[in-house]
Amino acid sequence: MSKTHFGFESVEENEKAKKVAGVFHSVASNYDLMNDLMSAGMHRAWKAFTIAQANVRPGFKVLDIAAGTGDLTKSFAKAAGPTGEVWHTDINESMLRVGRDRLLDKGVVTPSLLCDAEKIPFPDNYFDVVTVAFGLRNMTHKDAALAEMRRVTKPGGRVMVLEFSKVWDPLKKAYDLYSFKVLPWLGDKFAKDAESYRYLAESIRMHPDQDTLKTMMEQAGLDAVKYYNLSGGVVALHLGTKY
């Protein structure tokens, strides 16, 4: 059986999904806190940039994968309006429930669906925009997930991947110190869960860098793939178009 990475640990492919699920079941109730700790609060600016680049308009159909607590979903639903169709999806039931409840609390009524990005339950050429924010690095078969995202995107539509990436060299030493020393300590202090936060830091280091992910998206059949480095490469937003 093939091996894959769970953070820095080498595990069987069929074990990774279970281990990742355990992490997100554990952090679901504190997910927004987790994002604040991992990004020093910058995730709001990164998501705002992604929302602006998505340029969702009234009537659009949008698929938000690994949507978590629904930050992107909320903005997309408002932009698409009553004639649009925006799906809030996640493979993790705990995350999906937290996100669905949060959306309802904010007056956003939009469908939520338990969804594996490697087997997206929608027809070909269905969505105008497909997004995944901070979720791709946790997927076992990233190439399969990207191919599925392209499949369900309409011709002329876009796939957008917002993810932690490779930081610029002058920032690397400070970033490593924060990721491997400060972040687990914060996770233990504020969420009583140092191990989950340690995995999340490790998963970022194992994720493909900017150019590698660009190539993967091209190999999945997307065209005109480009990326924006945000905060010195801490995060990158990749965009690809389906022609």
UniProtKB/Swiss-Prot annotation:
InterPro entries: SAM-dependent_MTases_sf, UbiE/COQ5_MeTrFase, UbiE/COQ5_MeTrFase_CS. Its EC number is 2.1.1.163, 2.1.1.201. Transmembrane segments: none annotated. It comes from the Bacteria. Pfam families: Ubie_methyltran. PANTHER family: 2-METHOXY-6-POLYPRENYL-1,4-BENZOQUINOL METHYLASE, MITOCHONDRIAL, METHYLTRANSFERASE. HAMAP family: MenG_UbiE_methyltr. This is Ubiquinone/menaquinone biosynthesis C-methyltransferase UbiE. The lineage of its organism: Bacteria, Pseudomonadati, Pseudomonadota, Betaproteobacteria, Burkholderiales.
